[in-house]
């Protein structure tokens, strides 16, 4: 099983990347670290939820299909103000093309945005996150 790892950056926003596909998370870490972000990666839903509750992240990149609990469950916990009263992070769903329909409705309303992994390059990811305030 993969471990949680952090790619520190000297300054910048803190990102929690909840992604179990190692290749994808490595691409994100390289691109975002070069852009000055401080990136923490977690592959497991429950551990990611604990990290989000105990750390101040600016942005959370949340895959829907992750081990232990789904990204949808993580999102619901994060948006529950009783559980996460201090959470101010923007939550961006990262999904595969096949999962696009899953994020319609309530899920889309709870997230601050979503990205389809196959449709965005690392450079475009950095540009997109640069627009988030």
Where are these regions (language model features)?
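Short hydrophobic/Thr-rich beta-strand motif most characteristic of the beta2 strand and flanking loop
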Residues: 36-43, 51
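Acidic catalytic/metal-coordinating carboxylates
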Residues: 44, 70-76
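Active-site residues of response regulator receiver
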Residues: 63
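The feature encodes the CheY-like receiver
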Residues: 67
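As written
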Residues: 71, 106-113
